[in-house]
Structure formats: C-alpha cells, structure tokens
Amino acid sequence: MTWRTGCVMWAHKRQKGIFLLLLLAILTLLGGVAEAALPTDEGKADVWRIITLQSYNSRLVTLSTALLGVTSGLVGVFLLLRKRSLMGDALSHATYPGIGLAFLIMTCLGGEGKWLPGLLLGASITGVVGVILVSAIRHTTLLKDDAAMGIILGVFFGAGAAIMKMVSNLPGADAAGMDGFVYGTAASLIFGDFVLILAVTAFVCGAAILLIKEFTLVCFDESFAISQGWPALRLDLIMLALVTAVTVVGLQAVGLVLIIAFLIIPAAAARFWTHKLHVMLWLAASIGGASGWLGSSLSSLLVDLPTGAVIVLVAATIFMLSMLFGFARGILPRAVRQTRLRRKVGKQHLLRAIYEILERDQPDTAE
C-alpha cells in the first residue's frame, strides 16, 4: 500500500472532518488576507469583531447572505440534478423587466417608485411569467430546455434594459440606485430585508424537505414518474417557483447577474464529495451558508470590494478545493483510484500471463 492510497483510505473514513477542515482553512486564509489589508491594531480588532458578528450592520448583512446561501444551495441541488443550471440565469434575467415596470407603475400612481416590496412583487410576476413561458416552449415545441431558457434569458433581459432606460429618462423620477439590482447592494440590507429572507428561507427549505421524495423522482427519472401517475409538470413548476422565490429575494444581496453562481456553485461543489442526495443537500446548504458568511465578512473588512462578487469568489474557492479533493468525484482521489485499478488489472494480467506460460511449457508443473 502506497502513502497516497493510505491517505485516500483515511480520508474516506473521515469525510465530514476533512470537509470541515477545508472550511476552517479557508476561514483562516481569508482572515489572514483581511489582516494583511488592515495592518493597524484597530483594523485587526475589526477583523474579529466582524467575523464574530459583534457589529449590528455586519451581523445583519452576514446573517442575511448566509441564509440566502443556505436556501440557494438547497434548491440549486435540484436544478443541477435536473440539468437545468441555466434556468436560474433565465429566471434572474426574467425578473429584470419586472423591476422597471413596477417602478414605472408606482411612479405613475403617485407613490414612491423605489418601494422595495413593490419592486420585488414586479420581479416575482415577470419571473413567474418567464417560468411559464419556458415550460410552454418546452412542451409545445421541439426545442429543448437550453434553447427555451436561452430565448427567455435574452428577450427578458433586453426588455429590462429598454425599460430601465425609460426609467432613467423619466422626468421627475428618482431612479438612483436602481442599477443595484443588477450587481447587488448587500450593504444596504435592513432588518425588514432580513425578515423577508428568513421567511423565504423557512418556506423554501420546508417545501423542499416535504417534497424531497417527489423532487428526487422527477430529477432522476421523469418518464418513470409520469408512468406512475405522478404530476411531473406540477412538481416541475413548484420546483421552479421555489427557485424564483430565492432569485427574487437574492436580487438586492448579490444581484441578478451573480445569483446564478449562488444557485449552482454550492451544489456543484457538493457533488464532488458524495453520491448520496441527502448528504449532497446538506453539503450544498453548508457551502452556500459558509460562502455568504465569509464573503460578506471579508467585504465588510475591505470596503472597496462589492459584497456579491466577494461571496461568489469565496464560493468559487470552495468549488476549486472540492474539485481537487472531493472524495466522490475530485480530481486527485479519482486519479489515485484509477492508478490503483490500473495496478490491480496489471497484476492480474501478469499473473494470468505467467500461468499461461507455465501451463504451456510445463503442464505438469502448472497442474
């Protein structure tokens, strides 16, 4: 047994421990980067104060993004297994015209155009319309999912860009800050936003847990689900509705451009660690929550960095580590397993060749 084989066998017995050690290593690395960027004693004190949630503003933003990460990772697993990773991108872009239309309607009615509940309602409506159109194109034409989602993505984002241009040119309208929904403005989250994210997290996680058996069947074998009488189309729409809810509440935190990364990266990273669905769900939620917590903490320390982008970069770092060291599909463990298999096959071929030679040249000895 080589030392590499021994390391892999040891790691397989301690999967959760190694995964937690990787998260701890990332936390230590980010803390070191933050301390290097803030060399003063006051800056170093801020590192611990922000990471441990002692500051009210940082606590609000960190908890909100962590909850959003947990929910995004959870529903992202079903998107990934359903082979609809592009759906999150299509949905996020489908919400863009709804924000502009809601602003125009509220302004024309004499209200405050930037009233957040109204903007999110408009985003939800157009997001649902986008989901329905994707499903309609898929079931009424010969186009596949990727083509349908690509059409909806381009059309709705183009419409949103045109409407936002009208909003910016509207006389007397205060449209400042509307571009924050594109890239996210997590620093502007208030307590009401935290309550909304908490409520959506509880609802989405509860629905996903209650329907996990049905979602699993639809994700892995839709044809079998239909043959058994399961309402596959209805379950599909419920799943997309949960994704829409997560996308809408995540607009202000990470923006419609980066929300797709928040949905897919944690699920993709978790896929490298396990073949079991319930473990994958737990890992994806943990990776999403850790990415939101670490990313928002680091963004609070380095004020020139946007929160949404930092969160996605942290998630990408965890993804790269998972791609290298993940026990189920990681590059290094898979290379070790392939090397062991080749050696085993080579030994078997060698022994068989020796036996055939002995049997041919010395049949009595071979017997």
Language model features: what each stretch is:
Residues 57-70, 116-127, 198, 248-261, ...:
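Structural signature of hydrophobic alpha-helical transmembrane segments
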Residues 62-67, 120-125, 150-151, 194-199, ...:
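Hydrophobic alpha-helical transmembrane segments
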Residues 78-92, 99-171, 270-284, 298-307:
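Short loop segments and helix-boundary regions at transmembrane helix junctions
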Residues 333-367:
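Non-transmembrane accessory domains of multi-pass membrane transporters/channels
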